[in-house]
Swiss-Prot record:
The keyword Isomerase applies. It comes from the Bacteria. NCBIfam families: PRK00179.1 (NF001211). Its EC number is 5.3.1.9. The lineage of its organism: Bacteria, Pseudomonadati, Pseudomonadota, Gammaproteobacteria, Moraxellales. It catalyses: alpha-D-glucose 6-phosphate = beta-D-fructose 6-phosphate. This is Glucose-6-phosphate isomerase. Keywords: Cytoplasm, Gluconeogenesis, Glycolysis, Isomerase. It is found in: Cytoplasm. It is an enzyme of class 5 (isomerase). The active site is at residues 360, 391, 519. InterPro entries: G6P_Isomerase, G6P_Isomerase_C, Phosphoglucose_isomerase_CS, SIS_dom_sf, SIS_PGI_1, SIS_PGI_2. GO terms for biological process: gluconeogenesis; glucose 6-phosphate metabolic process; glycolytic process.
């Protein structure tokens, strides 16, 4: 390919062809050689923005590669697509909807979309009023007791985002009139819920039914179980449901039909995708945990990234760089798995959140025009809190046969903020934070440089099974500290990274048709398992055999 390219002027060759040529040309290039050739490589391949530092110098890229990645973005009309996203255009082409999660974090004084901003803030104010009432101990259950436990019942975007943020910002939990605990339930099998209900008192427990469609069977089956639990303890009175349930949905009529009082119904819109919805009233558990000011800081951090994404050239645009590095690794270096490694235990659920954000958005094989994709799309996204991962799967990263790209994430400061709870242990905990940071830097260094990172004397007689090849690419994202504002920034960076990659691949990141059919097939099988139907003739042999075992008709 590279020989044929040389026959034509550079500007006439497509960026994709040029990138393939660069892969061939630099196929044996090692990250350590890139650093040896550029003494100021860190300065050239890092971006500082607000409370963030993004270092991408440990990727297998050169200036020529970056130039062609930017050219690829231009040929895909990325700037135009960013403008379309931040309008009310129906960029979700299969469902004929806009994708306006960015509108959920617009400041109240934002003048470009006055009606949209007013709509959003009306619902946020209703949510804030409920938060204040619960925090003050003024919201009472059916027996008049103060609410002390709130259980969020949701799944997917109604669970992963709120749970991730609530856990990540545990240091910022606000004081309330009476201690308030927030819990999350998502699994449809009932085990999670069963374990939790044993710990709760019906009189002091409030449930949030969080479902965009108010038709998700996972969520409604859990909601029905807790309704029975409440009514068994408190009686079958209208006031039980009206006092102990809050609904968050696009479907006011369905919430009313279920029995939720109008004052306890928080609304969102069909232009908010579930996995992009934590900024809306789906984020009610977040606001209950970190308070109204904290929630507003979360929104402000995301809005700052929205502005950065729209108004910054590609060369300094962090979401664009994150996306294009992913394209380079996935589509040209054939690195089809990506690990997310936060070095902070508070980000325990961040990788799981990103799995949905990235793989449900970009796990597609059909382009916007209905044709099969021309490039591989989303890689497998996985990860774990870094120090734990070191004792689980870093062996594979360092000495396995799989090429893996990584994101290392860490806060620069901890245990020195006003919200720090354990002042008496501050010195020891600061040392522990430094221990985590040193491991974060050491692991990214060893992955990149391999044996080069070792002491030369140590390397001299080192057996091959103790050696490291290196050349595994990674980015490092440093936050000044992990707080509501910086977490809002971090999440929005990944949201926009996903969008940029969808533009390059020409796919719709805002639908999830692959999820729908499995639910429909489950609806067809449920009557068989419940004994209401017994015709198995249309099923495949495997499913028939498994159903017979489940029904006890044959031995397992």
């Amino acid at each position: 390919m590279s020989k044929s390219i040389e026959k034509f002027p550079k500007e006439l060759v497509s960026p994709i062809a040029q990138l393939h040529s660069l892969v061939e040309k630099n196929s044996k290039l090692h990250i350590k050689e890139l650093f040896a050739a550029e003494q100021d490589r860190f300065q050239n391949y890092s971006v500082k923005f607000d409370q963030l530092v993004f270092d991408y110098s440990k990727h297998r890229i050169t200036k020529s590669v970056l130039e062609q990645l930017f050219a690829l973005a231009k040929t895909k009309q990325l700037t135009h697509w960013i403008e379309r996203l931040f309008s009310q255009d129906k960029v979700n082409c299969t469902e004929q909807r806009a994708a306006m999660h960015w509108a959920l974090r617009l400041p109240s004084e934002y003048s470009k979309f006055p009606e949209l901003t007013k709509q959003v803030h009306n619902q946020l104010q209703r949510m804030y009023a409920l938060v204040e009432k619960i925090h003050a101990g003024q919201y009472r259950g059916a027996t008049g007791e103060v609410i002390q436990d709130v259980v969020n019942i949701g799944v997917g975007g109604s669970d992963l985002g709120p749970q991730m943020v609530t856990h990540a910002l545990c240091d910022f939990k606000v004081k309330t009139a009476k201690p308030l605990n927030v819990h999350f339930v998502s699994t449809m099998d009932g085990s999670q819920l069963s374990d939790l209900l044993h710990q709760l008192r019906p009189e002091t427990t409030l449930f949030i039914i969080s479902s965009k469609s108010f038709g998700t069977i996972d969520t409604l089956s859990n909601a029905q179980t807790v309704r029975q639990w409440l009514e068994k303890a408190l009686g079958k009175h209208d006031r039980v449901v009206k006092s102990h349930f809050i609904g968050v949905s696009t479907k006011a009529e369905k919430m009313t039909e279920w029995g939720i009082a109008p004052d306890n119904q928080l609304l969102l819109w069909d232009w908010v995708g579930g996995r992009y919805s934590l900024w809306s009233c789906i984020g009610f558990p977040i606001a209950l945990t970190i308070g109204i000011d904290g929630f507003q800081q979360l929104l402000a951090g995301a809005h700052a990234v929205d502005e950065h994404f729209q108004n910054t050239g590609f060369e300094q645009n962090i979401p664009v760089l994150m996306a294009l590095l992913g394209i380079w690794n996935n589509n040209f270096l054939n690195i089809q798995t990506h690990a997310v490694l936060p070095y902070d235990g508070r980000l325990k659920y961040f990788a799981a959140y990103l799995q949905q954000l990235e793989m449900e958005s970009n796990g597609k094989s059909v382009q916007r025009d209905g044709q099969k994709v021309e490039l591989d799309t989303c890689p497998i996204v996985w990860g774990e809190v870094g120090p734990n991962a070191q004792h689980a799967f870093y062996q594979l990263l360092h000495q396995g046969t799989q090429a893996v790209s990584c994101d290392f994430i860490a806060p620069i400061q901890r245990y020195n903020a006003d919200h720090f709870t354990y002042v008496e242990n501050a010195e020891a905990l600061i040392e522990q934070h430094h221990l985590a940071l040193s491991n974060c830097l050491a692991q990214s260094r060893l992955l990149a440089f391999g044996n080069e990172a070792l002491d030369s004397a140590e390397l001299k007689n080192l057996p091959i099974y103790k050696q490291y090849e290196g050349n595994q690419p990674s980015s490092t994202l440093l936050l000044k500290e992990l707080n509501p504002y910086s977490l809002g920034m971090l999440i929005a960076l990944y949201e926009h990274k996903v969008f940029v990659q969808s533009v390059i691949w020409n796919i719709n990141p805002f639908d999830q048709w692959g999820v729908e059919k499995g639910k429909q097939i489950a609806d067809q099988l449920l009557p068989i398992l419940n004994g209401a139907q017994n015709d198995l003739s249309t099923l495949d042999a495997s499913t028939r055999g498994l159903i017979k075992i489940l029904l006890g008709k044959v031995d397992g």
